[in-house]
A protein has these predicted regions:
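Active-site YXXXK catalytic motif of short-chain dehydrogenase/reductase
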Residues: 99, 155, 159
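NAD(P)H-binding glycine-rich loop region in Rossmannoid oxidoreductase-like domains
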Residues: 59-98
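Rossmann-fold cofactor-recognition segment
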Residues: 48-60
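NAD(P)-dependent short-chain dehydrogenase/reductase
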Residues: 134, 164-220, 225, 229
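C-terminal substrate-binding subdomain of Rossmann-fold SDR/epimerase-dehydratase oxidoreductases
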Residues: 214-217, 221-324
Length: 324
């Protein structure tokens, strides 16, 4: 694997972006976090503030994106900047500006600077899939990259369109791009996103607070943010000849919300978590990631118990509480 490449991470001061930056730094790469926010709080907590350059910018501004890529001499782009589920629903015009036009601007920058930019690794999402009932055949079913794509949210629809954009830029203009479809990200410092409320199933009990949650019988793919960061690095740097496709499912550990609550209770014995079966999640979580593992060597580092334990330890330390 090459080292000392400069990687421009859009959305690089956000939750996943900060962890991606940390993972890249630890693997020998120079990193520029490109974001509308220059708040380095998460980068600081991860201990990489001094190792990551921060550049203020807006992916919805085409000239700004091209200038950022050119002036940082980025050889790779990890494109994460997006308005997530709830924000996209509340601001549909902004969602199109950022998620659709912004992604187009990133691909266009890579096309324009084709002698400089080697690859764009970017975030699609499991949200492009339909609700589980569209796939459940009553057996041990898993959704592959070739299965039905029919998003039930505006956010998912923008990601579906992004995949069409990416294919055109790859097939018509030779832009080397790889997308991954992450599921539900969890870990220290998550604050936004459509599934961010699920963080409270860990955070509230860890701090001695009660919590009520719906979707008890719904399956969630719980993907630790450090595993997602690893996946983006592999998407960015796995040699092209080892890739069998351009879009990959990635996941962590599948568990119902009730099972996740039981895992928390096993770590925090006095946890007060009330779980009901009300509600249905808008997209399936049962992703088959055989292709990504075979092509890149990706392996999940955190099962649910280990991931929750790490998460709880960080939370308690930050709040001046004794470890469990």
């Amino acid at each position: 694997m090459a080292t000392n490449d400069t990687v421009l991470v859009t959305g690089g001061t956000g939750f996943i972006g900060s962890y991606v930056a940390k993972d890249l730094v630890e693997n020998g790469h120079d990193v520029v976090a490109y974001d509308r926010s220059t708040d380095d709080r998460i980068l600081s907590k991860l201990g990489v503030t001094e190792d990551v350059a921060i550049r203020r910018g807006d992916v919805s501004e085409a000239t700004d994106v091209v200038n950022a890529v050119a002036e940082t001499d980025a050889s790779h782009i990890v494109h994460l900047a997006a308005l997530l589920t709830n924000t996209a629903e509340s601001n549909p015009r902004a969602a199109l500006d950022v998620n659709v036009q912004g992604t187009s601007n990133v691909f266009e920058a890579a096309r324009t600077l084709d002698e400089q930019v080697e690859r764009v690794a970017w975030a699609s999402s499991a949200a492009i899939y339909a609700p589980p009932g569209n796939y459940d055949d009553g057996g041990d079913w898993w959704v592959t990259e070739d299965d039905l794509v029919y998003p039930d949210t505006l956010y998912g629809a923008t990601k579906g369109y992004n995949e069409h954009q990416a294919r055109v830029y790859n097939e018509e203009y030779g832009v080397d791009q790889v997308a991954i479809r992450p599921t539900v990200a969890y870990g220290p410092y998550r604050e936004t996103g459509g599934s961010a409320f699920l963080a409270n199933i860990v955070e509230k009990p860890a701090l001695g607070e009660s919590f009520s949650v719906e979707y008890g019988d719904q399956e969630i793919d719980w993907q630790h943010v450090e595993d997602i960061a690893q996946a983006f690095r592999l998407a960015a740097f796995t040699p092209e000849e080892e890739l069998s496709q351009r879009v990959y499912n990635v996941r962590g550990e599948l568990a119902t919300v009730q099972e996740a609550a039981e895992t928390v209770r096993g770590i925090v014995p006095d946890a007060e978590i009330d779980v009901s079966d009300k509600g249905e999640l808008p997209w399936t979580q049962r992703l088959d990631m055989t292709a990504f593992q075979a092509d890149t060597g990706y392996e999940v580092q955190y099962d649910l118990e280990a991931g929750f334990e790490m998460y709880i330890d960080v939370l308690r330390e930050e709040n001046g509480l004794e470890p469990l």
